[in-house]
Design a protein with these regions (language model features):
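Boundary/linker segments flanking structured domains
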Residues: 1-53, 57-183
């Protein structure tokens, strides 16, 4: 049995088009944008085109908007061309103590390696592997902080749970088929 050295929960907010994303970050009720270190987008000019997908990071805790904006090399062209289909997700570590550059790197590397065939614009880290065993649990919320449970409303690429086992150099991933909550 492999030892899993790191376990992180990433809380994703989305999907948002670019204007909704900007509004969300300006909202006083929203978590400070400095807590969002991960972002993912799906975009296409219109229904005639294939989806482009990309996951990225912003290690500086000075606001995700410094990275996710019209000057972004992959997202920017879609924003500037007023693409009809843009879905942006921003992610934060559920435990702010985990919000460290090395952890952000491990999580990004895990996503890129596990989903390299589905991330169309990620090219640099496709051959990298996480530096240690890691488990990521993804939870999804809309812009009103309500949990998203239906797969059709979540990012098309991600699973709910993703694990890399360093010792056996293997990945496991899957979705939670049913989650119930009680009050």
């Amino acid at each position: 049995m492999d030892l899993i050295e790191h376990t992180y929960t990433i809380q994703w907010v989305g999907p948002m088009d670019y204007e909704e994303y900007r509004e969300y970050l300006r909202n006083q009720e929203t978590l400070d944008s400095a807590y969002f270190n991960l972002y993912y987008f799906e975009a296409r000019k219109d229904a005639r085109y294939k989806w482009s997908t990309y996951i990225g990071i912003h290690k500086n805790n000075d606001g995700i908007d410094r990275r996710v904006n019209p000057s972004h090399e992959h997202l920017g062209p879609f924003i500037k061309e007023d693409a009809k289909d843009i879905k942006i997700w921003i992610g934060s570590f559920a435990n702010e103590k985990d919000q460290k550059p090395e952890n952000v790197d491990i999580v990004e590397t895990l996503f890129i390696k596990a989903y390299n065939d589905r991330l169309t614009n990620n090219t640099k880290k496709k051959e990298s592997i996480p530096s240690s065993s890691v488990c990521v649990i993804n939870s999804y919320y809309n812009t009103n902080d309500e949990p998203i449970l239906r797969k059709s409303e979540k990012p098309m690429v991600f699973d709910d749970v993703l694990i890399y086992l360093e010792e056996s150099d293997s990945f496991m991933h899957g979705n939670l088929s049913k989650m119930n909550g009680t009050k």
